[in-house]
Amino acid sequence: MNELEFKDWCREQQLATHTIDLIAQIRESPPSRRVQGRTKNVCGVYPSSKMGVTIQFESHTVELWAIYLMEHDPQVLEFYDQPPPFKIQYKNQAGRNIGHYHTPDFFVLRHDGACWEEWKTVKELEKLAQKYPGRYQNTASGHWRCPPGEAHASQFGLKYCVRTDAELNPVFTQNLMFLSDYLGFKSNLTTDVTHSVLAYLKANPGITIAALLQELNDVCANDIYIMIATELLYVDLSAVPLVEHYRTRLWVSQQNHDAYTHASVVSVTTKNTPSSPTTLLPNTALEWDSALWTLVNYGETTTTLLPESGFPIQLPTVFFLQLFDSGTIKIHNGVTDATINETVRTLMETASPVHLKEANRKFNIVQAYFQRHTDIYQDINPRTLRRWVQQFREAEASLGCGYVGLLPRTHQQGNRQPKSPTDSSELLDKFIKEHFETPRQATGASVYRAYVRACTALNIQPLSNRTFYQRLKKRPTHEQTLKRQGAKAAYATEPFVWELALNTRPHGNRPLEIVHIDHTELDIELRSLATGRLLGRPWLTLLTDAYSRRILAVYLTFDAPSYRSCMMGLRILVQRQGRFPSTLVVDGGKEFHSIYFDTLLARYHCTKKTRPGGKPRFGSVIERLFGTTNTEFIYNLLGNTQASKQPRQLTKTVDPKQLAVWNLGDLYTYLTQWAYSIYDSNYHDSLGASPDVVYTEGLSIAGERLHRRIAYNEEFLMATRPSTPKGQAKVQPGYGIKVNYLYYWSDAFRNPNVEKTLVPVRYDPFDMGVAYAYVDGRWVRCISQYYSTFVGRTEKEVLLAAQEIRQLNKRSATATNLNAKHLADFIANVQEHEALLLQRLRDLESKRLLDNLTSSNSSDPSVNQVHSTFAVLAQQSEDVTSQHVPSRNVEPLDLSSLPILAEYK
């Protein structure tokens, strides 16, 4: 709402002045806090088109679903996350007064009023209601309320609502997420397709999507979704997921759907058909003439019934149905026998296969005794036979099932009561809890010795060493590891969380719905192509599609994870796929939580989800892929670091640093070929097909969504370029703008109206020779003050030089302002600084990859010839090596003469 619409809304609600001021303050204020995920919560931000800002959520299954509902609810005018906190007071379970500041999840403005909303699961509310009965209460109607919050809201004539996950329909929410690319975005649809679909639906109302696509060859799933989003077709979004084409029914309008649905319900209720085929199943308990019978077989011609005692009988099915329809035979209500049935069920569940086999043998003999087949039980002792018959009849009379009376009772024999002294046993348990299960991680032998000393001091008999270790083994493994070694060590034994309720799929319903991004340091040592010098291990950035497990982007660099790696990963993704993911799953790394990164995701309507720290199972898709990359590719190359993981067994013959032959460019070439071709076409056990096949089929089912394609052009590249922490720079007359200690100039700065004004700025972290400024409604290219020195230099190299200068000034106790000339002079003498030289070598290796990515239109970048810059740098490297490291005698390697491994020919 704009200011005029807000005033009209306040006038309609007849709000008091202080209430209007409060709402205005909430509307103008940023979120009062930044959400953080707890141990099992996935938090993140959602780019709201309705609000024009990003909305935070602390739970991706409750709060995020609520955001989706409010985003598409026409009754919701505005909603704000994390509004300003207010103080609440209540009593806890012990009756103690508690007061603290509380921040609700949302403040929502609707057509009929405004309210604070707190969203939680029912299970969580039940626990909180026991702990804080004065704060959360469950009403008789099943609704939850918060009296302290309501008391605060009543002061302003507003409401405070406690909302639960029970109000969220998983299927409806899932369909909203599925249609998010079509809601609010323009999409092209020809009139011929619209007319053909509507005409066919009028003739065949309620047809499924699968049947419609099979009949109309010129219509695809993408067209159907566009018509649903634009309300040209009606689908009950709360019925079934849209991706299930064989179940999703289409209608011309909601009125048409309601009319056919009502007619079908009436026809079913009025149709006089016997209900027996759907209600009568084998082992169904029936009541006939006050006697209990069991339905053994319900056949087409005859039906077999078994009485409580006696022999089974057979009735013609037609006659049986007449008795059933007339009510003479009816289904037995087992409510009164719930206790008996529960006892029988417990006895049957606890019986072992050996016991069941023995009971079956006894049952056959007892049945032969009832039927007077003496030849079957003639070898059985008469006294034993009478005992079995008695056990059968007693169980039949008391439990209604004589079979359980024949189950062996050998497991109940013997004295099962504990024989150890109570004092000794309790003291042993105490020592295990207080001395063994502690972060001290004391050994079992030392704890047992302390236990024996304590028993001697108390003059009681200690339990044996064997009993002590048996008690240790019976303790829960997860809890014991948690107390001794901490949460990370115990995470491996933590039980899995199984989704048993109807929920959204954890890996999405379509390709590019959920994409994981993460970094890892590859287990391989690399050399410089120019000098043969060891450069260390590279960092790998991967983006993978959770739905199809397809690798979407691969990026290699020597730099530690930063926003530069994130930017390049997203650039490669858009270059190869032409799409931006709907949801990006990240970890807690600081490179994923910068303002620049969040702005980039919001710009392309991407929801960011943050995995809980120390819980790798939340990112199992990409964590497993890192392991696959190592085992299937990296570990087959020379210079892999498997041997160095056991340093005590490392020798020169297997030292990865001695065996290293790969350079960054060659490794990237073959790594992309493996990721985009080999892995992509291999069979995946979890999918039952290859990632490429699943990805392609997923696009055909979920729609290509061509209207959401992103062009890999200068506009996109500019959006991926970072800005400074301030975001703006002042145009200094004659100098231009200053970015990262450097001045940049453009002829656009000659305009007097631009001088001494703040303009938005961006820069290329891989080329500090240029920067960009937003002047007169367009981005202009600016040249560095010392362009010849800084062109091709990365941001990290310049910042490293600045750090070196600060360190030198600190040692000499001098204070020198960092400026472009000082930095240029310092970098020009790079041969005297090995740290800068190594960074330069790494940056030049990475520069080759960037040139390939920007110049090649193919998916698999190729390795170009070495530039002349490497020859100059090789001479500098030899000088540095001879001056600083004379003992190494590293000779340049001619990698072009090295043999290529057979598997990559």
Language model segments and positions:
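Conserved tryptophan-centered aromatic signature that marks the ligand-binding surface of SH3
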Residues: 175
